[in-house]
Amino acid sequence: MIIRDLPLKLRDFPEKEKPRERLLHFGAEHLSNNELLAILLRTGTKHESVMNLAHRLLRTFDGLRLLKGASAQELSSIPGIGTVKAVQILAAIELGSRIHKTSAGEHCVIRSPEDGAKYVMEDMRFLSQEHFVCLYLNTKNQVIHKRTVFIGSLNSSIVHPREVFKEAFKRSAASFICVHNHPSGDPTPSREDIEVTRRLFECGNLIGIELLDHLVIGDKKFVSLKEKGYL
């Protein structure tokens, strides 16, 4: 669905509706995803305004959900995008990701499930496949290492404790937190999620490297299996 009958050239928009002018007047945080993307794209096509082009691009990738993981080839194959616009989009996404990692800090202290979710949310909430990640912590609960252990549907027979604890020993970790995403955006834990959690928790108790929590990441939402009583 076209968002509405818009003029084809951005210069023909009413001054108060132009995305760049709105950003300067109100601030970037008050612009929609559509407007921010239109600023990146800069121009539309002969038959479509830049606002409609941005809207169509977001619709193609289910909003921002899949846009982060799109390749240059996938983006440039969309009519009206092309190589230059695809590169601009990917550069902006990567820059945002790097800024987030810098602000999070290399040795982020995790004191709560909210801290853990915040540390991984922007990296994980748009992934199109399940990623099982371990955050290894020192005695001060600082993240000393982050490792993707497995990619694919979570299964207790696939996520082997050996792989998880081998890295823990290598990093001299005092404890760890497991994190995995649900590509659907719904962080409700599955039976397999719970089984994997309990298995790793029991192994951690035997070895002396405590599993502090298992976080399931959705789209701007998360569930702590510790808070749910599974640890």
Curated annotation (Swiss-Prot):
Pfam families: RadC, UPF0758_N
Keywords: Hydrolase, Metal-binding, Metalloprotease, Protease, Zinc
GO MF, one example: metallopeptidase activity
Domain called MPN: residue spans: 109-231
Binding residue positions for Zn(2+): H180, H182, D193
GO BP term (any one): proteolysis
InterPro entries, alphabetized: MPN (IPR037518), RadC_JAB (IPR025657), RuvA_2-like (IPR010994), UPF0758 (IPR001405), UPF0758_CS (IPR020891), UPF0758_N (IPR046778)
UniProt motif (JAMM motif) ranges: 180-193
Record-stated family: Belongs to the UPF0758 family.
Protein name as it appears in the record: UPF0758 protein RBAM_025090
Annotated source species: Bacillus velezensis (strain DSM 23117 / BGSC 10A6 / LMG 26770 / FZB42)
